[in-house]
Amino acid sequence: MSMKWISVLLGLQLSCYFSSGSCGKVLVWPTEYSHWINVKTILDELVQRGHEVTVLTSSASILVDPNKLSAIKFEIYSAHLSRGDFEAFFIKLLNILIYDMPKDSFWTYFSLMQEFFWEFYECAQKLCKDVVLNKKLMTKLQESKFDLVLADTIIPCGELLAELLKIPLVYSLRFSPGYAFEKHSGGLPLPPSYVPVILSELTDQMTFMERVKNMLYVLYFDFWFQTINEKSWDQFYSEVLGRPTTLYELMRKADIWLIRTYWDFEYPHPLLPHFDFVGGLHCKPAKSLPTEMEEFVQSSGENGIVVFSLGSMVNNMTEERANVIASALAQIPQKVLWRFDGKKPDTLGPNTRLYKWLPQNDLLGHPKTKAFITHGGTNGIYEAIYHGIPMVGIPLFADQADNIVHMKAKGAAIRLDFSTMSSADLLNALRMVINDPSYKENAMKLSGIHHDQPIKPLDRAVFWIEYVMRHQGAKHLRPASHDLTWFQYHSLDVIGFLLACVATAIFVTTQCCLFCCRKVAKTGKKIKKE
């Protein structure tokens, strides 16, 4: 390690030593791709504040690079599969989700989605086993005396590690399908009458039939669709802990849930004390662009530029789709910077340049940027919100369609279908977003909402992590609803009791009235006889 990094580490340790003694040790159970990019922002800030951060990463990890110089520590464990196999699995999954999924059939689509989820979580369970069944590694983790586990719910295991190490747990997440984890483990109340289910692509302004559709989604996700094979995970967790338990039971013990959105994105809905929004925590003011890129941007003149990226997971696409897109881009007066790593499209215009990587945040913050063509990933959308840039959304998979629906409902985006859009569709969408001032105005309004917060999202995320470490948990924020059964939560037992009381009162009153009537009738007959 260079002297520079040794000095940095010594400085951090000394700052912690001379501070109030509140520096802690954080164990991280990470996820790949955009999830890692988001969490790493939090980790860098924790390290900057003097905390010791250790990331549990497998030898198969795709983005987590332990060899890169960093003040973050990495604990590498041997995985059952190679990095190449893990990456190939994701590429295969992406190709199926983007090109082969029958999106016009609800039942077929979600049935296949469940199959893919189960295959993914089968790999995830093996990674978890590689850690918790490794006695040497677990002994080392226990001896390290960590203060907290920071985990992403998309790959379970963080809650099991927290239970085994007997330390608090903080979650960082965007969503779970159907809000299953948030509702059943976090206890978050999400009334289907006005809160659209994630992946339903509905807004909070629902017609009667849309509310019917939303209720069907709720019932489907609650009683039919299983994101993960719960029985398998319940059995695995029970075997490891040596007592009967469930995945949801352990997840329910999470102290804080950090949701990677905010009210600039979300529709209004109830929130609980141990849930908080940290959307856009990775966003920052734009830096200067590389010289060559800045010259190209400046050459756009008054027309400005368009930024185009389909995210970190999609570096390629079919030639046919690439040519459709390139043809549309060639017809606009703006210069285009396109993140693309495939064969150069035949229809590529002189106004478009291809890059294997783009400084996306810096480009979106450039004064000449007019529009952002995005797949709808949460990180990219938040960079557009942060800088007030209107969007053309081309969602590919997962929550991306839902994200674009949110932006469309707020008047800051137009949505297109990747599989069916023509060059004319993309061209018209770009012209609309660039030339209709309402899109820019709405994007700037969202930007204003995002910036008008008492605490910055990153500071809020770090605050809650430090808060949990200071108080050895945050169980005082946990609502009592966690300890109630479903019928107690909905007061069905109380309603049943009250109905029984009313029924009993009616029955007794009726019987008394009948008795009195009979008495009066008998008395009347006696009087007549006399």
Swiss-Prot record:
The keyword rRNA-binding does not apply. It is a single-pass membrane protein. Residues 1-24 form the signal peptide. Keywords: Endoplasmic reticulum, Glycoprotein, Glycosyltransferase, Membrane, Microsome, Signal, Transferase, Transmembrane, Transmembrane helix. It is found in: Microsome membrane; Endoplasmic reticulum membrane. GO terms for molecular function: glucuronosyltransferase activity. The keyword Repressor does not apply. CDD domains: GT1_Gtf-like. Its main location: membrane. Its EC number is 2.4.1.17. Gene3D superfamilies: Glycogen Phosphorylase B (3.40.50.2000). It holds the Pfam family UDPGT. It comes from the Eukaryota. It is an enzyme of class 2 (transferase). The modification N6-succinyllysine is found at K136. It catalyses: glucuronate acceptor + UDP-alpha-D-glucuronate = acceptor beta-D-glucuronoside + UDP + H(+). The chain crosses the membrane at residues 495-515. One of its GO terms (cellular component) is endoplasmic reticulum membrane. Glycans are attached at N316. UDPGTs are of major importance in the conjugation and subsequent elimination of potentially toxic xenobiotics and endogenous compounds. This isozyme has glucuronidating capacity on phenols, opioids, and carboxylic acid-containing drugs. PANTHER family: EG:EG0003.4 PROTEIN-RELATED, UDP-GLUCURONOSYLTRANSFERASE 2B4. Belongs to the UDP-glycosyltransferase family. This is UDP-glucuronosyltransferase 2B31. The gene is UGT2B31.
